[in-house]
A protein has these predicted regions:
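Metal-dependent phosphoester-hydrolase catalytic domains
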Residues: 3, 8-66, 73, 79, ...
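Active-site beta-strand/loop signature of hydrolases that rely on acidic residues for catalysis
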Residues: 46, 105-111, 120-143, 159, ...
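Structured beta-strand-rich core segments of catalytic domains in phosphoester-bond hydrolases
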Residues: 51-52, 83-96, 113, 118, ...
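Internal/C-terminal transmembrane anchor helices
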Residues: 68-92
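Alpha-helical transmembrane signal-anchor/signal-peptide segments
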Residues: 94-106
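Membrane-proximal, lumen/periplasm-facing interface regions of secretory-pathway glyco-
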Residues: 100-102, 213, 219-224
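Short, well-ordered secondary-structure micro-motifs
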Residues: 144-145, 217-220, 271-274, 298
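A solvent-exposed, charged loop/short amphipathic helix patch at secondary-structure junctions
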Residues: 219-235
Length: 340
């Protein structure tokens, strides 16, 4: 005869109560993210950190099932499904690696201004990417970057500096055919450009992106001076940026070019911009072939996957995370193949 609740050890009842409480809180947090998206500080931060607070549900489901606790199982089911949807592809990818040989290696890296120069040097030395999409390249540092890396990447393009003083860049071992300013971006967005490369006779359009930075927990005065405004407005800017880049990728793809959109989204899996980009036909390379969570923001293991490589007209082969050096982001390296 199974023990009644009164007969169960106190520690067991306590653990069960904690598990149920976690499940209820995680379910409510998930509802907040899905309903409010990135529209306020709470929902944005919950979406950003979701990989961590959803993960315990994957462990609690089998434990609750083994213990025969229906209440615990019911409480943790929703967060477990969400966690499985996020982590499941990486498990599947481990058992079904892509067999194709890569034709091109692309990397993206938010250098945190000059702080990440050692990480950039390691990335270039150890991984030898053909194309680099870089963020937070201060105008004052460009000459130093060119002096140090120009011999390896003779073709380089820099965006105009944003109001925050930083800019994006595309470095390439392949010739640059054209550079076009991205128009139609919302107010508060950083400048962006489409850099078209000639890769062994094929056209490749590359966009290095750095979506609007959030103004988390900042004062009204600080929000007024932030280029994208307060948290809610910055969220709207990021979504509009994502839609514009997605439309741009569709236009370039329709013109016969392969497309790479890579950079720092300031958003994670449950935040809206990444969903927006993927819903318009761009393939998230890490989700397609990655085998680990790839939490690139913050020191390893990081707290969120905000740095991504998305492609159209190219097939993902492999992806990995590089060493950050002094940056607050880890680089993402993507091996790609031309369609057969």
């Amino acid at each position: 005869m199974p023990p009644t609740p009164e007969r169960r050890p106190t520690w067991r009842r306590t653990l069960r109560a904690l598990a149920v409480s976690y499940g209820v809180c995680a379910t409510l947090a998930l509802a907040v993210v899905l309903v409010f998206s990135d529209g306020n500080v709470v929902s944005y931060v919950l979406g950003l950190f979701a990989a961590w607070w959803l993960a315990p549900a994957l462990l609690l489901v089998p434990l609750a099932a083994a213990a025969g606790s229906r209440r615990t199982l019911a409480a943790v089911t929703a967060p477990a499904v969400a966690a499985g949807a996020m982590a499941g592809p990486y498990v599947v990818n481990r058992f079904s690696p892509v067999e194709a040989a890569p034709d091109l290696r692309v990397a993206t890296f938010n250098t945190s201004a000059w702080q990440g120069v050692d990480g950039l040097a390691a990335l270039v030395r150890d991984r030898e990417p053909d194309v680099l999409a870089l963020q937070e390249i201060a105008k004052s540092s460009r000459a130093a970057y060119d002096e140090r890396f120009g011999g390896l990447y003779p073709y380089r393009s820099y965006t105009p500096a944003s109001t925050q003083g930083d800019g994006d860049a595309v470095w390439s071992k392949h010739p640059i055919v054209s550079v076009d300013t991205v128009t139609g971006l919302p107010e508060g967005a950083r400048p962006a450009e489409v850099v078209t490369l000639d890769v062994d006779g094929r056209r490749l359009a590359v966009v290095s992106v750095h979506l609007a930075s959030p103004c988390l927990f900042c004062s009204p005065s600080a929000a007024r001076h932030s280029p994208a405004g307060d948290t809610a407005n910055a969220a709207r800017v990021r979504v509009e940026e994502a839609r514009r880049f997605a439309d741009l990728a569709s236009e370039r793809r329709a013109a016969g070019e392969a497309v790479v959109v890579a950079g720092d989204l300031n958003s994670a899996e449950l935040n809206e911009p990444l969903r927006e980009l993927r819903s318009h036909g761009l393939v998230d390379v890490h989700r397609a072939v990655g085998t680990r969570p790839g939490l690139t923001r913050g020191r390893s293991p990081g707290f969120a996957r905000v740095d991504v490589v998305l492609v159209a007209g190219l097939e993902p082969v492999a992806t990995r995370e590089g060493a950050p050096g002094g940056s607050t982001h880890s680089p993402v390296i993507a091996d790609l193949a031309w369609p057969s």
